[in-house]
Amino acid sequence: MTKLSHIRNFSIVAHIDHGKSTLADRLIQACGAIEAREMKEQMLDSMDIERERGITIKAQTVRLDYKAKDGKTYQLNLMDTPGHVDFAYEVSRSLAACEGSLLVVDASQGVEAQTLANVYHALDAGHEVVPVLNKIDLPAAEPERVKQQIEDVIGLDTSDAVMISAKTGIGIGDVLEALVNRLPCPEGDADAPLQALLVDSWYDPYLGVIILVRIKNGVLKKGQKIRMMATQAAYQVDSCGYFTPKLVQTTELRPGEMGFFTAAIKAVADTKVGDTVTDDKKPADTPLPGFKPSVPVVWCGLFPIDAADYEDLRDSLAKLRLNDASFQYEPETSAALGFGFRCGFLGLLHLEIIQERLEREFNLDLITTAPSVVYRVHKTNGEMEELHNPADMPDPARIDHMEEPWIKATIMVPDEYLGPVLTLCTERRGQQIDLTYAGSRAMAVYKLPLNEVVFDFYDRLKSISRGYASFDYEVDSYAQSDLVKVSILVNAEPVDALSFVVHRANAESRGRGICTRLKELIPRQMFQIAIQAAIGGRIVARESISALRKDVTAKCYGGDATRKRKLLEKQKEGKKRMRQFGKVEIPQSAFLAALKMGDS
């Protein structure tokens, strides 16, 4: 049994690619938790997609035993957290389970937008933050400049920042000593009623749902009857233990410790992340603070390219939902694309990852419709409904006004690219809140409509700043806006999958963009095809695909002109009839390209 004073719970916060998972690997190696032959890169990133993209999606935990220079053995619980904004709720929960953080900053790149967001999360959670400068072995490293930047931008004292290179292993011992000496030990009472914070949960085919917890008070034992305070569901603990990263079973988890338990729980949806686990017979009076259900921010339609894959898609979504409770879906039908699902995500990266996992792990070929955000529609009869799908928008005559979500975005950019970045934000209806400088980098804070960001804001930002700008956002509030639904008509038939909601000022340009793209992609027919963008009954943009023409007069040599005229008139009649009854088949490739985001 480890004394409370010998336990340290910490997480590592960093921007993507600043070396967080590599540092975790080195700490695991230095404490001898894994033999050298079993070591692999990004030890804690369990999904292939996490390893390939170099990002952490699910929070993971590992217990390390470290013999410090003072001769005592300390139990270090490392919580590896996601760094990306879409998983900000996972970050805030992981931080609530710890008392301190290592702030990892790349010594060549300096402070980035997500570094800021995550550090503020850590400071809000009351953490002791230890700055760590990584990649000091790089020729481009400028540790002194970056130290100054951390002091200017974040306000942390960097006089005793730890200098390391996680890749080569320089300074790892200093990090371990800093953890022991500078971070506070956890507090807790083993005799109080059980209070454990549910940090994460995932589905294991053999054990059912594995639940990751941090014990605040009381003791969690094998065979104990427990209750979830948010859902009021009761279970019996089958097994409990911890990860080193290998799974090790024990009989109990005590205050200050992090570990897991299993309890014959069938679905991850039954375990709400951030919930409090307590004893069924002797429950705690109050749950631990900070629980909030996660709400999808971005919605889009997923349709199988081959209609026969519909059942497989449904089963695959159900399996993914077992592991990711923040992801939601409901069945949807589209006249153009057939049967599919309307899915809700935490953000664009979350959407990409789910789509990639469906294609990779379940071998599905999918079409994704353009992502849309959740609008609030206030009707004239006083009702308010949330709109996930542009096709479901009520008749404009019944709408009083609409509201759209706005975000607070933080953009870090080298000052030579600041002009184009500010122009981009203004084009996207942004309102500047703040602009500050730290050395040669500027930090701009803007309020932006989320609708303008989901299309291609991130790609545009990266291209105008040559990849140097970093971007982070949080959903701020809803505000009233002049929004309209743009329908795309092909040969006077509306194509539901291509309709979208947009601000009135941008409706024409966005509609024209899609019409132009479809004109290039739909094959020519024997009759003229009109592609139109309409707001209600008013056409705002139109492109025409001219008809293929067969030369019907080719067989006439000389002779009377009336013969030719008769043939041409006959052809004209036929074309007219075709235009009336002809159906235009839009090929899949045209759909995919038209749905590719962007205003081009």
UniProtKB/Swiss-Prot annotation:
GO terms for molecular function: GTP binding; GTPase activity; guanosine tetraphosphate binding; ribosome binding; translation elongation factor activity. GO terms for cellular component: plasma membrane. It is found in: Cell inner membrane. Its EC number is 3.6.5.n1. CDD domains: EF4_II, EF4_III, LepA, lepA_C. Keywords: Cell inner membrane, Cell membrane, GTP-binding, Hydrolase, Membrane, Nucleotide-binding, Protein biosynthesis. Its main location: membrane. It comes from the Bacteria. InterPro entries: EF-4, EFG_III/V, EFG_V-like, EFTu-like_2, G_TR_CS, LepA_C_sf, LepA_CTD, LepA_IV. Required for accurate and efficient protein synthesis under certain stress conditions. May act as a fidelity factor of the translation reaction, by catalyzing a one-codon backward translocation of tRNAs on improperly translocated ribosomes. Back-translocation proceeds from a post-translocation (POST) complex to a pre-translocation (PRE) complex, thus giving elongation factor G a second chance to translocate the tRNAs correctly. Binds to ribosomes in a GTP-dependent manner. This is Elongation factor 4. It comes from Paramagnetospirillum magneticum (strain ATCC 700264 / AMB-1) (Magnetospirillum magneticum).
